[in-house]
Amino acid sequence: MAEIAPLRVQLIAKTEFMAPPGVPWETDADGGEALTEFAGRACYQSWSKPNPKTATNAGYISHIIDVGHFSVLEHASVSFYISGISRSATHELIRHRHFSYSQLSQRYVPEHDSEVVVPPGFEDDPELVEIFTSAVDASRATYTELLKRLEAKFADQPNAVLRRKQARQAARAVLPNATETRIVVTGNYRAWRHFIAMRASEHADVEIRRLAIACLRELVTVAPAVFSDFVISTLADGSEVATSPLATEA
């Protein structure tokens, strides 16, 4: 029986900032938040912090977002390793073209023991889950049989790697959209804000909305000044959404 894969979002990289010598400026932040402030001040050479309301890093970034000077958010980035997400959801995820992706390859990785992601609409209904898992088991059995026959068909191919790849790329056609995949995603702060605004909305598919909420929780720990304007709330059906009055690029 297919194993269920839980969603997991792991922070694996974030921007480090190194202040250039000779610039008469200091800040109360570090990393990507410091870089964001530096980039903004570089536009106007406002190193002396003449405005008390923007003298702190948080105050400065809040002002930047409020006035829509989003380009300075593009310098800092965050990378996540995401697992427990379905192929169906990553087809939506990769539509965000300002992200960079590296995803598990079904041509090189055999999927006969792959886990699956239960669609949110099934989770609270044991009968639907049973129907779903039965269908998944049947498709995996078909995949395994096709893989075996295709490997035999391509047995004359002397390159073992190519032989296996040819078999897997054909057999994967019967795998369900619910098959778990794993993916590395890198994006700058502006791209992540746009993703959260679009996909943490109540109008988004529930699975990718859960991903957006999980990413937001990590992003707030990395750069609170950039992402803490998003507020997470719970809908009547128990699912979560995140909204911000400053998310104007959705």
From Swiss-Prot:
It comes from the Bacteria. Its cofactor is FAD. A motif (ThyX motif) lies at residues 95-105. It is an enzyme of class 2 (transferase). Pfam families: Thy1. DUMP binds at residues 92-95, 103-107, 172, 199. GO terms for molecular function: flavin adenine dinucleotide binding; NADPH binding; thymidylate synthase (FAD) activity; thymidylate synthase activity. Residues 7-233 form the ThyX domain. Binds 4 FAD per tetramer. Each FAD binding site is formed by three monomers. Keywords: FAD, Flavoprotein, Methyltransferase, NADP, Nucleotide biosynthesis, Transferase. One of its GO terms (biological process) is methylation. Pathway: Pyrimidine metabolism; dTTP biosynthesis. CDD domains: ThyX. FAD binds at residues 71, 95-97, 103, 188-190, 194. Homotetramer. Catalyzes the reductive methylation of 2'-deoxyuridine-5'-monophosphate (dUMP) to 2'-deoxythymidine-5'-monophosphate (dTMP) while utilizing 5,10-methylenetetrahydrofolate (mTHF) as the methyl donor, and NADPH and FADH(2) as the reductant. Belongs to the thymidylate synthase ThyX family. This is Flavin-dependent thymidylate synthase. The lineage of its organism: Bacteria, Bacillati, Actinomycetota, Actinomycetes, Mycobacteriales. The gene is thyX.
